[in-house]
């Protein structure tokens, strides 16, 4: 298993989320299973479980069916949250720039999908 630390701000001394990659890379070179733990001594009212598993799509949808989430789905969630912060009292330049880059990332992934559809290879392991 491999730990991810890209989400940690080096100057932040607070308890951090622990992200673990819990599988081997697939045919495309990317992993599919991630586990997130958050630890803490305080049990909050209405608390949710202190871990989350994220399972990404394994294999082309046309061949394997839908069996996990996509980068696009997770980016859409992050974009929604950033748009909400920008519409509320926590609007700031940093959030605006982050939002723009997330929207741009989603646009490039959509562009890739559209090009694959045009070539007739979307949903397959073909280039």
Label each residue range with its predicted role:
Residues 1-41:
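Short, charged/polar N-terminal "headpieces" of proteins
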Residues 7, 32-35, 55, 101, ...:
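Histidine (H) residue identity feature
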Residues 80, 85-120:
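Short, compact, well-ordered microdomains
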Residues 119-127:
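Charge-rich, acidic-biased intrinsically disordered regions
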């Amino acid at each position: 298993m491999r730990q991810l630390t890209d989400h940690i701000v080096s100057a932040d001394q607070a308890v951090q989320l622990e992200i673990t990659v819990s599988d081997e890379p697939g045919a495309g070179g990317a992993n599919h299973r991630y586990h997130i733990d958050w630890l803490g001594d305080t049990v909050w009212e209405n608390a949710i479980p202190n871990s989350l598993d994220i399972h990404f799509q394994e294999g082309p949808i046309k061949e394997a069916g839908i069996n996990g989430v996509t980068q696009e789905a997770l980016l859409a969630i992050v974009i929604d949250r950033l748009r909400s912060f920008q519409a509320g009292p926590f609007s700031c330049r940093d959030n605006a720039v982050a939002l723009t880059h997330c929207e741009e990332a989603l646009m490039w992934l959509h562009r890739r999908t559209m090009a694959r559809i045009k070539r007739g290879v979307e949903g397959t392991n073909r280039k």
